[in-house]
């Protein structure tokens, strides 16, 4: 819980300093920056300090359970007490789905998640709390957007776009009440399966969009291929290189977007 808000500022500072020190290196380099958030959403609402006062016994049992996990932290439940803005004022329409009409795995997984992870129970009738969960999720993204924006500005100031490949992606989403579910679960809804994947290379001076299906297993081959790796090097990895999609997909230049009415 709260590992994103605890560690992401440190990850950002180390990344920023590393880029400042190595931006002009003559030798090619590879840098992977992995922020934790928006993963903190998994622990809502037990990671909120107001919840501790409202449900002290539940919080106490959760804290004892978390203390058994050797994460190397002084406090495995430090708590989140920043203000959460109201980005949205309505729940998604599919929040009102009936889980009794869905596959049994939905209910079984939710029950197990609440029992063993103990993130805090949210009543179906407490729509205000479900909405707060979504706004918390969005706020975690906003916090990380600040770091990403600063890193991109640094890349621009150091004129790195001319010789640097940048890839942005994530591992999974969160239901946050969509289909009346929480967390990443064991289902194939768009909210957790449709991940952002942006690739920018020095050779691209226009935007391209593709609806082609890809997977995280394709990333290693794609990175090696973009870096000019040999076929022998590529054969060591599973998946497929996505470089073909950069040249063979739906193409939108600014003129084309205008013509399409975008």
Each model region followed by its residue ranges:
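Non-catalytic, well-ordered alpha-helical segments in soluble enzyme domains
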Residues: 202, 211-248
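Active-site-proximal alpha/beta segments of enzymes that process anionic O-linked groups
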Residues: 1-27, 35
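A short aromatic-rich beta-strand->coil structural motif
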Residues: 30-33, 197-198, 223, 262
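Single conserved hydrophobic/aromatic residue that forms the stacking wall/gate
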Residues: 252-262
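Active-site-proximal cap/lid insertion segments
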Residues: 24-25, 35-163, 167-170, 174-213, ...
């Amino acid at each position: 819980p709260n590992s994103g808000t605890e560690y992401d500022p440190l990850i950002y500072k180390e990344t920023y300093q590393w880029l400042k020190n190595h931006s002009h290196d003559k030798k090619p380099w590879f840098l992977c920056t992995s922020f934790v958030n928006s993963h903190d959403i998994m622990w809502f609402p037990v990671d909120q300090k107001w919840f501790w006062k409202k449900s002290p016994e539940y919080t106490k049992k959760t804290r004892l359970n978390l203390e058994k996990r050797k994460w190397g932290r002084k406090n495995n439940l430090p708590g989140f007490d920043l203000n959460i803005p109201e980005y949205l004022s309505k729940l998604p329409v599919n929040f009102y789905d009936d889980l009794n009409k869905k596959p049994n795995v939905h209910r079984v997984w939710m029950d197990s998640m609440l029992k063993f992870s103990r993130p805090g129970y949210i009543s179906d009738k407490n729509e205000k709390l479900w909405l707060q969960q979504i706004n918390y999720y969005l706020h975690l993204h906003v916090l990380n957007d600040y770091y990403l924006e600063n890193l991109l500005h640094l890349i621009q100031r150091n004129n790195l776009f001319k010789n640097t490949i940048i890839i942005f992606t994530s591992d999974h989403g969160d239901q946050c009440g969509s289909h009346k579910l929480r967390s990443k679960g064991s289902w194939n809804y768009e909210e957790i399966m449709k991940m952002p994947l942006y690739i920018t290379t020095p050779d691209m001076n226009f935007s391209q969009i593709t609806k082609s299906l890809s997977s995280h297993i394709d990333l290693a081959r794609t990175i090696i291929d973009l870096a000019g790796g040999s076929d022998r090097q590529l054969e060591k990895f599973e998946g497929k290189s996505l470089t073909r999609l950069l040249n063979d997909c739906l193409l939108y230049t600014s003129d084309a977007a205008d013509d399409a009415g975008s």
